[in-house]
């Protein structure tokens, strides 16, 4: 089924220009949304919790910073860009008591609405504007007169304005310059979680670690194992990102290309595909999110345990040592330590 693509000519920028927008959160996406909205002639304030380290950054950028509750009371469009695990609490404590008839509540990701962790009143427009790129890219492309493609969706539309409002907002952050794709909260949420868990984060992470273990256990130097299964990953991913799998195969040696064809199906077997389907089923049923919420309520012991296990894996110590040799590689964790 062909997707619908919408552009600036399809959007009415005056819709969002006529609203007062509170951006809740000033992280990667929050700073980009706020600055692009302001440059597009939209009245914007930033909502942050008391004591947030982002307050100074937002004020230095020229924004008025309010508490989450005061920002919600002031605005008639609220974009909630806090972390997924914080959104339900922010909504119930700060936003919900301050919602007014006709307000719109927007999200950058559909998880909390799709899995009903947040349930706005029926008189509230609920939509999503999700750029398919990190905030710094959204901002840079906007400044350059371009844009990052956006997904939009509507979950509640009491006034029949949801799609037009979401499209107007997407245009104001540059998305309609590149293309805006209407979708649903369900589709965005479930495919996003699946991609993260099966390929981008969980799958890739464990593929690299297992490859490292096989080489190290076979007697090869850990440094060589790191180079071959992790360091060179960026080279390959960049080729795929730029031109697809065909471009990657075109760009590598014939030896590497043939080896990939021969060995790939031995690693990613039909059983692996069945495991992927099982992960998708856990996402669709809500099991993953229920488990995540339970972990958050318990103080995140599971998340902390997983982090400790990864930090203790020898691939991390080996990588840290080797990256010290690479002056062109900067570790963001070093800057926040």
From Swiss-Prot:
Record keywords: Amino-acid biosynthesis, Branched-chain amino acid biosynthesis, Magnesium, Metal-binding, NADP, Oxidoreductase
Active site: 109
Domain KARI C-terminal knotted: 184-329
Binding-site residues, Mg(2+) 2: 192, 228, 232
Sites where the protein binds Mg(2+) 1: 192, 196
One Gene Ontology term from the biological process aspect of the record: L-valine biosynthetic process
Residue sites binding NADP(+) per the record: 26-29, 49, 52, 54, 84-87, 135
Cofactor note: Binds 2 magnesium ions per subunit.
Swiss-Prot/TrEMBL catalytic activity: (2R)-2,3-dihydroxy-3-methylbutanoate + NADP(+) = (2S)-2-acetolactate + NADPH + H(+); (2R,3R)-2,3-dihydroxy-3-methylpentanoate + NADP(+) = (S)-2-ethyl-2-hydroxy-3-oxobutanoate + NADPH + H(+)
Occurrences of domain KARI N-terminal Rossmann (ranges): 3-183
Any one Gene Ontology molecular-function term assigned to this protein's record: NADP binding
Associated pathway: Amino-acid biosynthesis; L-isoleucine biosynthesis; L-isoleucine from 2-oxobutanoate: step 2/4; Amino-acid biosynthesis; L-valine biosynthesis; L-valine from pyruvate: step 2/4
Cofactor(s) this protein requires: Mg(2+)
Annotated binding of substrate, by residue: 253
Role of this protein: Involved in the biosynthesis of branched-chain amino acids (BCAA). Catalyzes an alkyl-migration followed by a ketol-acid reduction of (S)-2-acetolactate (S2AL) to yield (R)-2,3-dihydroxy-isovalerate. In the isomerase reaction, S2AL is rearranged via a Mg-dependent methyl migration to produce 3-hydroxy-3-methyl-2-ketobutyrate (HMKB). In the reductase reaction, this 2-ketoacid undergoes a metal-dependent reduction by NADPH to yield (R)-2,3-dihydroxy-isovalerate.
Family: Belongs to the ketol-acid reductoisomerase family.
HAMAP family linked: IlvC
Protein name: Ketol-acid reductoisomerase (NADP(+))
Organism name: Corynebacterium diphtheriae (strain ATCC 700971 / NCTC 13129 / Biotype gravis)
Classification of source organism: Bacteria, Bacillati, Actinomycetota, Actinomycetes, Mycobacteriales
Gene name of the encoded protein: ilvC
